[in-house]
Amino acid sequence: EDIRWPVGGEIDILENRGRISNISSSALHFGKQWNKKSTLVGEALIPREVRFQDKFHSISLVWKENYIAFYLDNSLDPYFTINSDHPEFQKYKYPFNRDYYMILNVAVGGKYDDYWVDFDAFCSDRACSNKENPDSHRFIIDWIEYERL
């Protein structure tokens, strides 16, 4: 099936900004072409006293016909839900009722976050390098589980 982006839609299960450690987000992208599209974002707010990066977390995606929900860890309440009745799907067709491929894009940085660059966050000394201790600064995916309901 030759469906181009963003017509076919994109589901981002997890997106984070390194400089904002108390927000984890998920996003849906869809539309007619790259400059005529919508992006819907849901954010899970983590209390500031909790260091989100100090332990593994589970991001769950419940994906049913005309409905998508995202959950953080063991919460019974989703932090982001969308269904095909959302007003943005009046402008652009709801594309999420079809099969998808899973792609793990584990990029860090880039032009996400409104092109904002925190130059103070660049690693320029041994204190922020992980050369001597690779475990100190990594993005680790422990496991992925797929279950068809």
Q: Which role does the model predict for each range below?
A:
Residues E1-L149:
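GH16 jelly-roll
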